[in-house]
Regions:
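A short pocket-lining beta-strand/turn micro-motif at the edge of beta-sheets
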Residues: 86-88, 98, 112, 118-121, ...
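Conserved positions in beta-strands of structured domains
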Residues: 43, 78, 106, 123-126
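Extracytoplasmic/periplasmic cell wall- or extracellular glycan-interacting regions that localize
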Residues: 1-86, 91-93, 132-171
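Short, well-structured beta-strand-loop connectors
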Residues: 69-71, 75-76, 110-124
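Conserved beta-strand positions that form and line the central face of beta-propeller blades
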Residues: 60, 91, 101-104, 124
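Short, surface-exposed secondary-structure boundary micro-motifs
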Residues: 47, 82, 120-121, 127
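Short histidine-centered loop motifs in beta-beta connectors
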Residues: 80, 95-119
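Short glycine/proline-centered loop/turn elements that form peptide/ligand docking sites
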Residues: 109-111, 121, 127-132, 136-140
Length: 171
């Protein structure tokens, strides 16, 4: 019985308490639970070619213009704003040495220091791609780039995505 209660607090039900100011579960324990930050078609995957001679350190999702971007996990906003050729960049500290980088949005609606919850709207996509490295693709729609890091090193985000996340576009 106690085991079932502990399991309920660390599973998807733990995300429902919207008054939290700390992650519901440790990021390392969230494998298979995280929603994609925007629905869309995956056009580049971790470890594949980045289109400009390098290796992709995250995933790229083509979305609809104006699509809402949500947080894939609980965390603290440590950066929110323009960065080099990435368009608007959002960096979340997910705890335990994990950071989530989300780039390519047109507008960000959260502030540095803010605690955000899984699924919380944080940004909006523009009408075209904002990420310069994506220009090497044939994508004509906006592209969101998502990268997970552990202790500063990019890691494959694949194991964290929820199995029921489809590659459908929502706007």
């Amino acid at each position: 019985e106690a085991k079932a209660a502990a399991s309920a607090k660390s599973g998807p039900a733990a995300f429902k308490d919207r008054s939290r100011t700390t992650p519901a579960i440790a990021f390392a324990s969230a494998k298979g639970l995280l929603p994609l930050p925007v629905n869309g078609n995956k056009i580049r995957d971790f470890g594949g070619s980045d289109g400009v001679g390098g290796v992709q350190k995250g995933i790229s999702l083509a979305s609809k213009p104006g699509a809402q971007v949500t947080t894939p996990c609980d965390g603290w906003v440590v950066y929110a704003g323009p960065f080099r050729s990435y368009g608007q960049l959002l960096i979340l500290n997910a705890g335990g040495g994990y950071h989530v980088l989300i780039a390519g949005m047109e507008r960000i609606s959260v502030n540095i220091g803010q605690f955000v919850l899984t699924g919380e709207p944080v940004a909006t996509m523009g009408s075209t791609s904002q990420v310069a490295s994506i220009l090497a693709t044939t994508a004509s729609q906006p592209v969101l780039y998502v990268e997970f890091r552990k202790d500063g090193t990019p890691i494959d985000p694949g194991p964290w995505w929820a199995a029921n996340e489809g590659e459908k576009v929502r706007g």
